[in-house]
């Protein structure tokens, strides 16, 4: 019996843990080949190791799926392009991008530093743009593709000490 994502290739950012991991595992279980992107950074976005992405790839492969790991930063347009191109090179196409990468740098607005505000906006806003834009040319050439942008209710109703996260 055909699965919903048979033959599709999906990039999931922030897929080394949490919701991103579950999305990557679900996509693979539905037949997609998955590009598992994660820096392996802390929730604050510090540190870096590809082991989180590699662990999810190992889970997918152990379950009979197909996946590759990517440790690039969504904040870097060239790294975003490279993660899309890695999927195309390995699997022949890219069909969907799930922009799930995120960090937290909570702080009361009057105490928040520019660096903390900027770091969150770079991951959440520019990161989603960078990966989506990198995929757009392929989607146009293929005459189709899907962008999924994860968000939080903090952006709709706000939350204490999350001005940067809500933006």
Label every PLM stretch briefly.
Residues 110, 157-166:
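Active-site loop immediately N-terminal to the catalytic Tyr-X3-Lys motif
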Residues 63-66, 86-99, 105, 144:
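A glycine-rich helix->loop->beta "capping" turn
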Residues 71-85, 114:
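The beta1-alpha1 cofactor-binding region of Rossmann-like NAD(H)/NADP(H)-dependent oxidoreductases
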Residues 3-35:
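Canonical Rossmann dinucleotide-binding motif of NAD(H)/NADP(H)-dependent dehydrogenases/reductases
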Residues 152:
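Residue(s) in the substrate-gating loop at a strand-loop-helix junction
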Residues 83, 98, 131-135, 149:
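Hydrophobic positions on the long internal alpha-helix
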């Amino acid at each position: 019996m055909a699965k919903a994502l048979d033959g599709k290739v999906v990039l999931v950012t922030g897929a080394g843990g949490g919701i991103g991991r579950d999305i990557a595992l679900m996509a693979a279980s539905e037949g997609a080949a998955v590009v598992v992107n994660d820096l392996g950074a802390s929730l604050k976005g510090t540190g870096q190791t590809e082991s989180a992405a590699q662990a999810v790839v190992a889970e997918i492969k152990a379950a009979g799926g197909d996946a590759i790991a990517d440790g690039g930063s969504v904040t870097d347009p060239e790294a975003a392009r490279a993660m899309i191109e890695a999927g195309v090179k390995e699997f022949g196409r890219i069909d969907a991008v799930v922009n799930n990468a995120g960090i937290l740098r909570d702080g009361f607005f009057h105490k928040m530093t520019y660096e903390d505000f900027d770091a969150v906006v770079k991951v959440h806003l520019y990161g989603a743009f960078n990966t989506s834009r990198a995929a757009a040319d392929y989607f146009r050439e293929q005459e189709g593709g899907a962008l999924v942008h994860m968000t939080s209710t903090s952006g709709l109703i706000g939350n204490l000490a999350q001005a940067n996260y809500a933006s």
